[in-house]
Amino acid sequence: MEWTDEGIVLGVRRHGESSAIVELLTRGHGRHLGLVRGGAGSKLRPLLQPGNSVSAVWRARLDEHLGYYVLEGTRMRAAMLLASSHAVYGVTHLASLARLLPERDPQPEIYERLERTLDDFDDVGEAAVHVIRFELTMLAELGFGLDLANCAATGVTSDLIYVSPKSGGAVSRAAGEPWRDKLLRLPPFLREGSAQRNDWSDQDLQDGFLLTGRFLLRNVLEPRGQGHSDARDGFINAVVRLRTRELAETAPPK
């Protein structure tokens, strides 16, 4: 058995004296593990960092075997990602989410979303938007997608600003007003047709994390006996800290 694919490094663990088991999210073969000979050595260490993109050749005698990887770097992001606290936390959090996917099940939309997210970590606010959208996509792939296209109460498709915490359906301003204190807020960047960069406020980011965090916890993590990772909390805190600093630096002098 042999195949060649694109992949993103999710994690690595030592195996024996010199080898390592590498976990990739691949474009065409899903989340897939393989043994890399010499993977525990210093020569391959820079390549096998989470967030790097690689060209992967996988070989095994039988399809169900662990198999061996031969990897070549195609986009070495790790050095840039390790240079900022929000990116370090973000990559760790994204990898932990990707591990919720079943092994060897192709998830091309998740792969492309992860790739776009990793390529845009230099902008703190946009990185936060990407992570929230990644969480939303993960919910859909795991069978718990939110219905944000129309109002769950009336069916209208405009002025959707709330989400029901029970059903996960969008709610319009008019229909939700009597229960506004019990509804979650739907940030503009998650509404249909919103794709502009920097089309968000810091409150929008907080609303987005609260929204996806609630449904991830209730529908995905708690049934597995898990909670939100420390990396997710660290990422959110780093974003808040860096955004506060950015706003202070750009504020006009008093």
UniProtKB/Swiss-Prot annotation:
Pfam families in alphabetical order: RecO_C, RecO_N
NCBIfam families xrefs: reco (TIGR00613)
Entry protein name: DNA repair protein RecO
Leader sequence segment: none
Keyword terms: DNA damage, DNA recombination, DNA repair
GO biological process, one term: double-strand break repair
Top-level taxon: Bacteria
Keyword Acetylation: no
Family affiliation: Belongs to the RecO family.
Entry GO CC: bacterial nucleoid
Organism from which the protein derives: Rhodopseudomonas palustris (strain BisB18)
Role, per record: Involved in DNA repair and RecF pathway recombination.
